[in-house]
Design a protein with these regions (language model features):
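Ordered, amphipathic secondary-structure segments that act as subunit-interaction surfaces
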Residues: 80-100
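N-terminal active-site beta-alpha-beta segment that forms phosphate/nucleotide-binding
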Residues: 1-87
Length: 100
């Protein structure tokens, strides 16, 4: 695994470890989020973690189902407890930047 992939995996796992039982979790799209979903799936199996994921894309919904993450919609649960997504850049002031 490359250094960049290892850093994304670590970030994803750390984000997933912030999720608590009963939370509604926004799930973005991309490699870092997919690592977070991998870890959430592990926690669901090993700890009995009970969460509901709200995916931002069809691809994310498919991956979440593969990891055993129960899903809901933003229409049914418009208030999320936490959202996990990646960022293209972070400024020194900790602002996230998107590069189209």
């Amino acid at each position: 695994m490359s250094d960049a992939a290892a850093a994304k995996r670590d970030a994803g796992f750390r984000a997933a470890d912030m999720v608590k039982d009963g939370m509604f979790v926004g799930l973005g799209t991309g490699s870092t989020v997919f690592f977070a979903m991998e870890r959430l799936g592990e926690r669901i199996k090993s700890e009995g973690l009970r969460i509901s994921g709200v995916p931002t894309s069809y691809q994310t919904a498919q991956r979440a189902e593969e990891y055993g993450i129960p899903l809901t919609t933003l229409s049914l649960h418009p208030k999320l407890d936490i959202a996990i997504d990646g960022a293209d850049q972070v400024s020194p002031e900790a602002f996230l930047k998107y590069k189209p």
